[in-house]
């Protein structure tokens, strides 16, 4: 026999008008906020990832792969010199 937690059943929540009034505003707002966050370039600045036109510079057109197991620090230093 299971106990009652006192919470409303999920079916009652999603069929209520109040739920849809609140979520018809918040869900599109979150979508628009996420779209603006990415389209303005703020996501690149916040997370520090390079913008699409910054992956390859004029000096370095190849993919920066670490190929050596024991000299990886030197390879990373070479890659970061171009930044």
Curated annotation (Swiss-Prot):
Q: Which GO terms describe its biological process?
A: photosynthetic electron transport chain
Free-text remark on how the cofactor is bound: With its partner (PsbF) binds heme. PSII binds additional chlorophylls, carotenoids and specific lipids.
Bilayer topology annotation: Single-pass membrane protein
One cellular component (GO) term of this entry = chloroplast thylakoid membrane
Q: Which controlled-vocabulary keywords does the entry list?
A: Chloroplast, Electron transport, Heme, Iron, Membrane, Metal-binding, Photosynthesis, Photosystem II, Plastid, Thylakoid, Transmembrane, Transmembrane helix, Transport
**Compartments, record wording:** Plastid, Chloroplast thylakoid membrane
TM helices/strands, residue ranges: 21-35
Q: Which PROSITE patterns match?
A: CYTOCHROME_B559
Which GO MF terms does the UniProt record name?
electron transfer activity; heme binding; iron ion binding
Q: Where does heme bind?
A: 23
Q: Which domain of life is it from?
A: Eukaryota
* Described purpose of this protein according to its UniProt entry: This b-type cytochrome is tightly associated with the reaction center of photosystem II (PSII). PSII is a light-driven water:plastoquinone oxidoreductase that uses light energy to abstract electrons from H(2)O, generating O(2) and a proton gradient subsequently used for ATP formation. It consists of a core antenna complex that captures photons, and an electron transfer chain that converts photonic excitation into a charge separation.
Q: What quaternary arrangement does the UniProt entry report?
A: Heterodimer of an alpha subunit and a beta subunit. PSII is composed of 1 copy each of membrane proteins PsbA, PsbB, PsbC, PsbD, PsbE, PsbF, PsbH, PsbI, PsbJ, PsbK, PsbL, PsbM, PsbT, PsbX, PsbY, PsbZ, Psb30/Ycf12, at least 3 peripheral proteins of the oxygen-evolving complex and a large number of cofactors. It forms dimeric complexes.
Which protein, by its recorded name, is this?
Cytochrome b559 subunit alpha
Q: Which gene encodes it?
A: psbE
